[in-house]
Each structure stands twice: as C-alpha cells, then as structure tokens.
Amino acid sequence: MKNKQNRLLVVLVGAFAIGIGREPASAQTDTEHTARFVGSEACKGCHVRVYDDWKQTRMANVVRDPKEHPEAVLGDFANPDAVRTFTLEDVAFVYGSRYKQRYFAKRGDDYYPLPAQWDIAKKRWLPYHVEPGTDWWVPYYGPSNFDRPTGPTCDGCHSVNYDITTKTVTEWNVGCEKCHGPGSEHVAHPTKSNIVNPGTLDAIRGNDVCMQCHSQGRPLSNPIDGKYYDWPVGFKPGERLADFWKLEELKLGTTGFYQYPDRTAHKNRMQGNDFVQSTMYHRQLRCFDCHDVHSNRNESNLIETGNELCLGCHNRQNPAGLKGTVSEHTHHAAGSAGSQCIACHMPHLEQTIKDNYVAAHTFRFISPVESEQSGIPNPCTSCHADKTNAWAIEALKKWQNVSPWRVAN
C-alpha cells in the first residue's frame, strides 16, 4: 500500500504540476497586481497532460452552450412534460452534469433560471423554484428564480474572472486560473514565484482555493452597487478567503435549509462548511490530499478509491494489516459495503433534490442516538433500512468504544 508521503507526492506533482515545497503566500503572488487572466488554453503548451486530463473533468464542463454542445443537454426535451414549460430553444446555457441539470435563458445582458431542472439519476423533470424563507436571497431578489440573475448568484464560481461591471468572463467553467490565479506573467516567464501553486500554500490558504466555491456563505462586501452576491467577489488564490467571505452561520440543534441539527450540511456546495468543523481540517489536511482536481479517473476525482485512500494514513499503528484493521474497526467483513470507511464517516445525506445525496465532510460518525434525538440520518439505519434506531443503538453497545488504531499524532 502506498503510504501518506507517496500519496502527497502524487498530489503535489500530479495535481498541481508546478513544484514541490511550500512557499509563503507572498512569494507566490508577487505579480498579482500586474498579471492578467489569459485562459486555460495558454497553459496547455507546457502542461499538456494536466490540461488534457482537466479538460475531461466536470470542472471543465459544467456550463455549456447547447447550440455549441448539443451533447451536453441531458434533459428530455423530446417528450411533453407538465413540469417543463419551456423548450430547448429558450435555453441559452445549461449548468450541471452529475446530480441535476439546470437551464437558463438570456434576458438583456443577464441570464435567469428556467422553472424546471432535470434529475439526472431519476431521469425526470422537477420544479426548480425557491421554497419561501429557505435562503437569504429572498429579501434582495424576491421568491422567484426569475428575479435572480445568475451573475450575482452563480456565475462567479462557474467561470474564471467574472467581471461584475461588464458581466463578462475570461472563460466559463473552472479553468486553470480559478485555482492558480492570473497567469500572464507565468506564461511569459515561467517561474515558481509568479504563479500560485495551491500545493505549496499553507493549509488554510490551500483549502481556501477550493472553499471559494465549495462553501455556503456571504461576501463581506455585500451589497455591491445595490446587488447581493453569493460568491466571494474579488478573491484570488493565495489570499485569505476570510478577508472576502463569511461562512454561513450554522446553529447547533437547528434543522434548516443549510444544516442538520448537528451542523452537518443539508445542502449541496457545503463541503467547506463541513470540513472546517473536522479534526482533519485542524490537522492541516487539504482538499487535494484526497482529490486530484485534474483527474477524471473516478466519480469524485479521488487520488485513490475505496479504503486505500483513508488507510494510507489510518493504518500505521495496527500490526494486523489492511484486512484485520478493517474488520476490527468496522465490525463488518473486509470488502463488504459496511467495511468502507466512507460508509460510516462520510455518509450520503439527502440534499436539495429528493433522493439525491451529498457526502458529509465532517468525517464524524453520526450515532443512532443522535438520530433518535434530532432526526438526523445515521449510517447504520441508512444501510440497514429495515432496522430501527433502537436496534442500531443496541448493536453498537457490543462494539469497542475506542478505535484499536489511530493515525500517529
């Protein structure tokens, strides 16, 4: 099995491909005031393999123009449907390709959501509307999606260099410069000091690169020219996200649009809100220690799949080896669904579309006792759907209270 050091080397070389060894943020951003955005195509000449891999990822293909990319349209426009009241001709571009796909029309120089979304897993149309009182935009944009231009609410994360004044972008989708910052200086004179390498930033700033979009919150600068934004306007990689963005406040014991009672995310795009609550985050783990953002090798862009990823770190103290560790810790046979680390520590919790799920990123085991008290789903009865919380509580009493192994401190 690969150990942690080998995996991190893969991350830093393969995922970022610009160098190893951490540098102060200032050393990497000395040209931030002079560098311009040039687009991902400018990176391809030197980083051919990384570019080609990235080009196949969802990051590079979430936003598509259906006229240029008809294959990107996943919804059924051929058959009439009472939920879908618009035609493909009304669609200026589409968002999404994994859980749901949403459709947007152009009105003036802005884009607006159309009233139905495609549930990709169930292959069905569902209403796309805002439930009254479920998000903080209502006082500023009204309860209807048709009053909400995508510039303030969506486009900053689904593009590179969205200009809030001209409403233009360098490119749609998450391109190289979304994570590495403006690249003109680096393209002209490639050095480590004139481009941001998230892999060599400190853990907080490194995670901020991902959390600029993978978190729910509000810009500190709201409102801007009378508009309220749902992404960190002005933030660039290498800077502190906290100077631009305040994470949504999650209150213990409250069930709501954003959270379960234990503050675990109840909505998509909240991996960062989960992660900052975790021991992993406070131990300096970074998003890209697990995810290869340039890779399309598996569904979640993981460096390794299954238990291999977790046990690269969480297996050092157990002489029993891989199979013994899994069986001892999970009380399930190695190779079974219940023996997967993520089955208990990253359970899939229902998100905004019914029957669609997001993986919790607190890495905390949610006990059936908590389910009994507050109604939050737990991993035990999520798998053993025919059982009750009371059954799961009794079953866990027979387990060891302390894990027989931990990662070394």
Locations of regions flagged by a protein language model:
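Signal peptide processing junction and immediate N-terminal pro/mature segment
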Residues: 22-28
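N-terminal secretory signal peptides that target proteins for export/translocation
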Residues: 1-5
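A gly/proline- and charged-residue-enriched helix-loop-helix capping module
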Residues: 132-139, 147-153, 159
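Bacterial N-terminal signal peptides
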Residues: 10-19
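Short HxH-centered metal-ligating active-site micro-motif
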Residues: 46, 157
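Short, charge-rich binding segments
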Residues: 106, 145-146
